[in-house]
Curated annotation (Swiss-Prot):
Protein's name according to its UniProt entry: Isoleucine--tRNA ligase
Record's subunit section: Monomer.
Cofactor descriptive note: Binds 1 zinc ion per subunit.
Gene from which the chain derives: ileS
Organism: Baumannia cicadellinicola subsp. Homalodisca coagulata
Alphabetized GO MF terms: aminoacyl-tRNA deacylase activity; ATP binding; isoleucine-tRNA ligase activity; tRNA binding; zinc ion binding
Pfam families: Anticodon_1, tRNA-synt_1, zf-FPG_IleRS
Length: 938
């Protein structure tokens, strides 16, 4: 028997079936580096319209985690898709390099700055440590396939950036937004530092819950305000608090001016509390018998004096709208140095703002003899005992509530009043302008707008000063008596900035003030506070972007970070930019969720559910991680697990196998020489190109709306349904069996060529390594990289007016699906092996029958059967299957008649008619020895 294998056009390609990504990707990265791929991209896109995504700098400490990977991959997908859309879209990666975590790491390595380690040595060690961390993180980001200007990254510790941060502060000072105040701020005892709002996390915490008596200094005055005779032995306010340790700093009692307050009589004692809470509070305290004496509005009691429970002074009653009746007694113990609301009341009433707590969280000497030098948290019980001994404690218990904690140490915070520098949110209407700017921005997801609006509405003034070493110096001089800034502050800060450009922040510490101030030095003090690291990163729109030539005279289009950055980088950038130029620094803000495990829990070493991006990449390849990111709706928390990654692997295989089939069937195809014009192509091939055009339009729309999971879904639909389950199955016979150079085969190859040209671009932003690999196997002359291409422009739509339009082929898809069902049932029953062992009868209503007959004897190629007959719908017997998709269609399936062709495997009646080729059908004989078969439709 003749071996007919050599007469077939079997698929052939060097493009491997298996990705072996963990091995191949590093090789590709090496080639990208040798190509200087990023510069090739910049050259190719020079002069085009611009799209700028500004990289929010990750902190230069520790290995990258899965959240970092999500962030960088999303940015890379956007930038690569924008280049496909014809944009010049440079990407400058950055790092946040100053701050306490690095200081603490360096302290562990060399000790604290002091006697053994000088400040300059410590700064050098911090800089070296941060540089080392950046190097490692950069390597990991590059491994993810992120294309950027890795040779020209920005770091907030770069000398020129440090200088520009000083200049940014100078502009904000010039615009009148900065002031110094002795104001309570979140303070971490372990950090020995003030914390920014973005560095505060909230956890459940158990605190003391106590009810304290503040007795009136003059019961006659209080009774008079209530309009009653002075018949009670005492009158006291009943105060509830969860921070007994702050009572030594109490300087007032706050009540709401418009709430009703009742004086109630218990035995011969009078207690004042909010009228709405009397019953619930007294019942809770175990007081069964009381009498309501009088009810009045809070404002009537303003400025009455009440004795501090154990200190030798009295305090006033003050009015405040922040007092509520949600919890407590409607009467608030007020310590202006230990709470933001208390501080504001203190300023309004000119109360003493006394700092009783040191940086270590211990009471300062002179606070109270029993408390001096003890930890505030350990002293809660001491204060409670003091209150009890003085008869000022009515009840003690505990309460579990949400409480601020340090994001680094996970330990509870205190509010502590220290001299700090602030950006005022209201002095120059910065809050009002920021809220206006928020409305102009595109927020993705849209509910982000409400989140940041609420945060801006409720945030306190921004404490921008820190009492540390490793950071950008504020570069200020303050008058010793007036405490005002030097009148030439702008000029001084510019001088310092120029010195910092040469020597870094060490220039400030080395600076001799006399060189700047001359004889005026006796009147001014050098401020050695450094800036909050959130000011560093939040001002990069000014300190970095304005200094980058790539971004010259262009606004930033997009910021993209995790959901926690609403109160972090998005917030600090918004405030600093609005303070400088009255407008937001970005046009669009995208927020992504956190990576969580299959149970919805955040990644945690203690839980043991951490998914390491390095391990995923080393095992599965970066493209699998990238595909997981793109496949997940990033606007919510993103679930990752071994099972989910397996699904990404399955998705990847489908895409890769589709690409491999296309490439393998382009064997021997040279586009310039063999391409068939669209009007001469077989109709099914025109339809395939039409489907690719429709898919591309939808994919581009999804990229434009940043819905990458929709991109993946549409690519999968195209590969699995339109191609894999229909077109690619059908064309195998024509591709393999028709003559090598026939129009029938070249038409098909032309379609496959156009499809792979389009498809490689669709996947390039997501599975970048695989797209790059495919690019090298597509026939024809081409540019050095898919990443300098734009969307493929040689697709086309079918003419909707022609009879074999989309609607026609959709009908055939439905018919084929029903036939496939019958074939699959026959396979399950083991009645057949291959679909080519069958012939099918389609009992059709007249209109459908007419449509089916349009394909003539090519219809059976669509159905993958050896034969097909079309009969009248009414002739169908009870054995025919009623189509579930088309009302006017019933189907029967039978064994094909004839013998099996050893070449095409169809069952035909004419096998053996040709004595030279007795094992094959007449169609195959024509394709081997004749002029070749003709195809019009399929």
């Amino acid at each position: 028997m003749i071996d007919y294998k050599n007469t077939l056009n079997l698929p052939k390609t060097q493009f491997a079936m298996r990705g072996n990504l963990a091995i191949r990707e590093p090789i590709m990265l090496k080639r990208w580096h040798q190509q200087d791929l990023y510069q090739l991209i910049c050259q190719a896109t020079q002069g085009k319209k611009t799209f700028f995504l500004h990289d929010g700098p990750p902190y230069a400490n520790g290995s990258i985690h899965i959240g970092h990977s999500v962030n960088k991959i999303l940015k890379d997908i956007i930038i690569k898709s924008k280049r496909l859309m014809g944009y010049c879209s440079p990407y400058i990666p950055g790092w946040d390099c100053h701050g306490l975590p690095i200081e603490l790491k360096v302290e562990q390595l060399i000790g604290k700055p002091g006697k053994k380690v000088s400040a300059s040595e410590f700064i050098i060690a911090c800089r070296n440590y941060a540089s080392e961390q950046v190097t490692w993180q950069k390597k990991d980001f590059i491994r993810l396939g992120v294309l950027g200007d890795w040779d020209n990254i920005y770091r907030t510790m770069d000398f020129h950036t440090e200088a520009n941060i000083i200049r940014t502060l100078s502009k904000i000072i010039e615009n009148g937004h900065v002031y110094q105040g002795n104001k309570p701020v979140h303070w971490c005892i372990d950090c020995r530092s003030a914390l920014a709002e973005a560095e505060v996390e909230y956890y459940d915490y158990t605190s003391p819950s106590i009810y304290v008596i503040f007795a009136a200094t003059n019961t006659h005055d209080v009774a008079a305000r209530f309009g009653i005779p002075n018949v009670l032995s005492s009158i006291s306010f009943l105060v509830w608090t969860t921070t007994p340790w702050t009572i030594p700093a109490n300087r007032a009692i706050s009540i709401h001016p418009n709430l009703n307050y009742q004086l109630v009589k218990v035995n011969q004692q009078g207690f004042i509390l909010a009228a709405d809470l009397v019953t619930s509070v007294l019942t809770y305290l175990g007081i069964q018998n009381w009498t309501v004496v009088k009810n009045i509005k809070g404002y009537v009691l303003e400025l009455l004096r009440f004795s501090h429970p154990f200190m030798k002074f009295d305090v006033p009653v003050v009015l405040s709208n922040h007092v509520t009746i949600n919890v407590g007694t409607g009467v608030v113990h007020t310590s202006p140095s230990h709470g933001p609301d208390d501080y504001l009341i203190g300023r309004e009433y000119n109360l003493e703002i006394v700092n009783i707590v040191g940086p270590d969280g211990c009471y300062l000497p002179g606070t109270f003899s029993l408390l001096d030098g003890t930890s505030v948290y350990q002293s809660n019980q001491t204060v409670i005992s003091l209150l009890k001994d003085r008869g000022a404690l009515l009840h003690t218990g505990t309460i579990q509530h949400s409480y601020p904690h340090c994001w680094r140490h996970k330990t509870p915070l205190i509010f502590r009043a220290t001299p700090q520098w602030f950006i005022s949110m209201d002095k120059k209407k910065l809050r009002q302008q920021s809220l206006k700017e928020i409305k102009k921005i595109q927020w993705i997801p849209s509910n982000s707008q409400a989140s940041i609006t609420n945060m801006v509405n409720n945030r306190q003034d921004w404490c921008i000063s820190r009492q540390r070493i490793w950071g950008v110096p504020m570069s200020l001089f303050v008058h010793n008596h007036t405490k005002k800034l030097h009148p030439q502050t702008s000029e001084i800060m510019e001088y310092v900035a120029k010195q910092v450009e040469k020597k870094g922040i060490q220039a400030w510490w080395d600076l001799d003030p006399i060189k700047i101030l001359g004889d005026d030095i006796v009147n001014y003090s050098k401020i050695n506070d450094i800036l909050d690291v959130w000011f560093d990163s939040g001002s990069t729109h000014s300190s970095v972007i304005n200094a980058q030539t790539e971004f010259a005279n262009h606004e930033i289009d997009m910021y993209l970070e995790g959901a926690d950055q609403h109160r972090g980088w998005f917030m600090s950038s918004l405030i600093s930019s609005t303070a400088i130029k009255g407008k937001a620094p970005y046009k669009t803000v995208i927020t992504h969720g956190f990576a969580v495990d299959s149970n919805g829990r955040k990644m945690s070493k203690s839980i043991g559910n951490v998914v390491s991006p390095q391990q995923v990449v080393d095992k599965l390849g970066a493209d699998i991680l990238r595909l997981w990111v793109a496949s997940t709706n990033y606007t919510d928390d993103m679930t990752i697990s071994d099972e989910i990654l397996k699904r990404s692997v399955d998705t990847y295989r489908r895409i890769r196998n589709t690409a491999r089939f296309l490439l393998a069937n382009l064997n021997g195809f040279e586009p310039k020489q063999h391409s068939v014009s669209i009007d001469k192509m077989i109709i099914l091939d025109q339809w395939a190109i039409d489907r690719a055009q429709v898919a591309q339009d939808e994919i581009i729309a999804a990229y434009n709306s940043y819905e990458f999971h929709s991109v993946v879904q549409r690519i999968m639909q195209f590969c699995s349904v339109e191609m894999g389950s229909f077109y690619l199955d059908i064309i195998k016979d024509r591709q393999y069996t028709t003559q090598y150079n026939s129009i029938a085969r070249r038409s098909c190859q032309t379609a496959l060529f156009h499809i792979i040209e389009a498809m490689v671009r669709w996947i390039a932003p997501i599975i970048s390594f695989t797209a790059d690999e495919i690019w090298g196997f597509i026939p024809g002359k081409r540019s050095p990289s898919v990443f300098i291409e734009e969307w493929y422009k040689n697709l086309s739509r079918l003419d909707a007016e022609q009879h074999m339009n989309d609607t026609y082929w959709n009908t055939l898809l439905q018919v084929r699906s029903d036939v496939n069902y019958l074939i699959e049932q026959a396979r399950i029953k083991k009645n057949i092996g291959s679909s080519l062992e069958t012939q099918v009868t389609l009992y059709s209503e007249p209109i459908l029958a007419m449509q089916l007959r349009q394909l003539g004897n090519e219809l059976h190629f669509v159905l993958l059967t050896s034969a097909v007959q079309i009969a009248d719908y009414q002739e169908a017997d009870n054995n025919a299957l009623q189509s579930t998709r088309i009302k006017g269609l019933k189907i029967t399936l039978n064994h094909a008649t004839g013998r099996k062709c050893q070449r095409c495997w169809h069952y035909e009646q004419d096998i053996g008619n040709n004595t030279q080729y007795p094992e094959i059908c007449g169609r195959c004989v024509i394709n081997i020895a004749g002029n070749g078969e003709e195809r019009k439709f399929v």
